[in-house]
Structures are given as structure tokens and as C-alpha cells.
């Protein structure tokens, strides 16, 4: 039921009815703003179903405010990951079309796959390509990706792809190292067994599992300074 009537107690100890409406809780996984003239910051807190659309809208806002963007910081710190197709899409927003984003490899034939920066690898059934709304300049704007020990899974896929293709400078601390693929094998009507069946690999073939992504520039998060300094050099 969408509505729920629940009794409550008042401060006088008397009960009274309260109607609770059930609604979907929508969390905002993308934030961003122009930090200073020519430079912007966009943060992804996780990779959800709405993340790609929200990312595109935020980039549109940034370029409307600052059409001559000189540099962008993509902040993936403490982003635990999420959906693989969202990670492929975010990577594709910055990379040339059809280059490799990530691959999986395991002992079984079905665990071997390659995911490229192409709509067929991130579009959902019946949906259009949101990346078509992005300004062409996003493919070449100087880019810094911020990561730390809390960046995992999908975050590491994005950071690894942008690093391997030399599209961005990755800055921060070594990432978590969550690069395994789990598959659930049904055992009965109500039971199943989750097995690790493959690992994720960056475009150059580096395993993400346990090793994570090592930044190009190692930075202590407590250190003073600005990531925009790397964009200006």
C-alpha cells in the first residue's frame, strides 16, 4: 500500500492517527560548481541509475555558466561505486568513441568481456543517449580525477580508464581495490551461492582487485593546495 495509517502518542500520552505516504527516496549523487573563473569541480558520490543523467545536467550547467572552461576536477573520493554501465558512460563522456574502458576475465567463457566507450555498452533499453547533450569541448578539457582509499569499484574503473588513456591526471591516494565480479548461482527456491567469477582490468591490462589505482600524483588529503594547480601546468 502507498499509504499507511500508524497510531502515535502525543506528549499527553493520548494516541492520534498519522498517515504516512510511501515515496521513492531520491538521492543526489552528483554535485558541482564553478570554483573560480575557468575552472569547475564535479563530484560523484556513487554510480546509480540516475547518475549519468544528473552528470550530464551538471556539466550543461557548468558550461552555461563558464563556456570557456579551462579545466575540470572530477571528484571520486569516497565514492564506493555502483553500476557498471554508469561507470562506462562517465568514462565515455571524456574518452574518444569506442576505446576500451574496462574488461573482465575469469576461468569461465562467460566471464570474459570487454566494455568500450560506445552507447551499446551503457544505454538502457528504450532510452536515448544522454551523452549526446554534452558539449564537444568536454572531450579535450584538461582533467584531474581525485581519488582516495574510499574510492572503489566503479570509481576505480573510471579512474583507471582515464589514467590509462592519458586523458586525466589522477591525484590523491591509492584506491580501495574492489575489482572482483560476483555471480549468484541459484541452489533452490530461496537460496543461492555468491561466487567471485572474474576480475576487472583497466585498458592496459592492470588488475584492479586488491591493488586499486595508484595516482599519478600522490597527495595527502590533509595537505594544503589545490588540484587546479595541476590543470594550470
Please provide the spans of the model-predicted regions.
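Conserved functional hotspot residues or short segments at active or partner-binding sites
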Residues: 192, 199-233
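Short, intrinsically disordered/low-complexity patches at protein termini
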Residues: 65, 108-109, 126, 194-195, ...
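Generic secondary-structure microfeatures
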Residues: 147, 197-199
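Cleft-lining beta-strand/loop regions that shape enzyme active-site pockets
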Residues: 1-188
Amino acid at each position: 500500500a502507498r499509504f499507511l495509517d500508524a497510531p502515535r502518542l502525543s506528549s499527553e500520552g493520548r494516541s492520534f492517527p498519522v498517515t504516512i505516504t510511501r515515496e521513492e527516496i531520491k538521492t543526489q549523487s552528483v554535485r558541482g560548481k564553478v570554483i573560480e573563473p575557468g575552472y569547475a569541480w564535479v563530484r560523484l558520490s556513487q554510480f546509480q541509475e540516475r547518475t549519468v543523467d544528473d552528470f550530464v545536467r551538471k556539466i550543461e550547467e557548468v558550461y552555461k555558466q563558464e563556456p570557456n572552461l579551462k579545466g575540470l576536477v572530477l571528484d571520486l573520493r569516497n565514492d564506493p561505486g555502483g553500476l557498471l554501465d554508469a561507470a562506462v558512460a562517465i568514462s565515455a563522456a571524456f574518452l574518444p568513441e569506442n576505446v576500451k574502458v574496462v574488461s573482465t576475465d575469469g576461468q569461465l567463457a562467460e566471464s570474459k568481456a570487454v566494455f568500450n566507450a560506445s552507447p551499446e555498452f551503457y544505454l538502457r533499453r528504450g532510452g536515448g543517449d544522454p551523452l549526446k547533450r554534452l558539449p564537444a569541448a568536454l572531450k579535450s578539457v584538461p582533467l584531474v580525477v581525485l581519488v582516495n582509499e574510499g574510492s572503489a569499484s566503479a570509481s576505480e574503473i573510471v579512474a583507471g580508464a582515464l589514467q590509462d588513456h592519458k586523458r586525466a591526471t589522477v591525484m590523491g591516494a591509492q584506491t580501495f581495490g574492489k575489482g572482483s565480479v560476483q555471480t549468484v548461482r541459484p541452489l533452490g527456491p530461496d537460496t543461492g551461492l555468491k561466487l567471485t567469477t572474474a576480475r576487472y582490468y583497466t585498458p592496459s591490462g592492470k588488475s584492479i582487485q586488491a591493488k586499486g589505482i595508484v595516482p599519478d600524483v600522490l597527495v595527502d588529503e590533509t595537505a594544503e593546495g589545490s588540484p587546479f594547480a595541476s590543470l594550470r601546468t
